[in-house]
Amino acid sequence: MNEIVLSEEFIIWLYALKNIQARKKILQRIERAKDGNFGDYKQLADNLFEMRIFVGSGYRVYYTKQGNILYLLLTGGDKSSQSKDIERALKMLEEMEK
């Protein structure tokens, strides 16, 4: 079982979502990720991954793996803000690795 750690930024983003169905689906995906089932995801950089949730406007959750057991959810967004969200996730990852 994986340990999931949520960044403060991710928590704020998640609970600010107006689409309750999307929030529910994202939380379900996080629960499945605890068991190692990340569903539809894509590796974006060496240690940055994008979990894709196909509901509403197409939500994305950006995360990194630290070791074999700890997963950190960095930030989230939808398809319209994808480029900006990836830049933000990379910046957060860089800060974590210092």
Regions found by a protein language model. Give the residues of each.
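Solvent-exposed, charged helical/coil patches
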Residues: 1-31
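A short, surface-exposed loop/turn module that caps and links secondary-structure elements
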Residues: 28-55
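Amphipathic alpha-helical interaction segments
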Residues: 18-21, 49, 70-71
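Enriched for short, Lys/Arg-rich terminal
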Residues: 3-4, 12, 23, 38, ...
